[in-house]
């Protein structure tokens, strides 16, 4: 089902995200920071992204604006996250900001169906990251959620045609 063409878009985005969370086989990816430390993040959704032939997927104004806002919010907190100094309250605030932007992206999406299908993977990882940053999984850290969001942002930059976006 297309997020962009459904009046229940936000609810469906959350349901799709929860389906990804419940998937029994989550791929384990290594996330390497420029500072040298590593941590594991579950990143099954964006691992499924593919290019549109040899080119990136189309974007619309709502998607570009929302992803820019998510990127800016994440980058503002990234130094504290990277240093291990992000507080639970800061993680909660960042998660709320990302969730608001994702809801807006989904509600206002006008992508062609194939691009929309690939966007589902980015949205799923963003929302799983939001859940983890809120402390939604006692076996995972809030930092794991931030790493998942970071991976989703990098994947968006790699697979979607957004000339202004720098991941």
Predicted ranges, named:
Residues 13-24:
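Bacterial N-terminal signal peptides
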Residues 71-74, 92-107:
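Short N-proximal segments of mature Sec-exported proteins
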Residues 101-120:
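Short, solvent-exposed, charged loop/turn and helix-capping segments
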Residues 119-167:
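Helix-rich interaction surfaces within compact, conserved domain-sized segments
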């Amino acid at each position: 089902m297309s997020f962009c063409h459904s009046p229940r878009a936000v609810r469906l985005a959350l349901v799709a995200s929860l389906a990804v969370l419940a998937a029994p086989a989550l791929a384990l990816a290594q996330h390497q920071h420029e500072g040298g430390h590593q941590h594991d993040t579950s990143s099954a959704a964006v691992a499924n992204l593919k290019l549109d032939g040899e080119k990136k997927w189309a974007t619309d104004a709502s998607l570009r604006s929302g992803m820019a806002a998510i990127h800016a919010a994440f980058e503002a907190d990234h130094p504290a996250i990277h240093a291990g100094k992000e507080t639970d309250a800061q993680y909660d605030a960042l998660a709320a900001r990302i969730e608001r932007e994702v809801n807006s992206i989904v509600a206002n999406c006008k992508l062609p169906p194939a691009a929309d299908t690939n966007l589902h993977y980015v949205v799923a990882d963003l929302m799983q990251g939001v859940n983890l940053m809120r402390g939604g999984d006692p076996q995972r850290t809030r930092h794991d959620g931030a790493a998942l969001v970071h991976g989703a942002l990098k994947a968006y930059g790699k697979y979607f045609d957004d000339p202004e976006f720098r991941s």
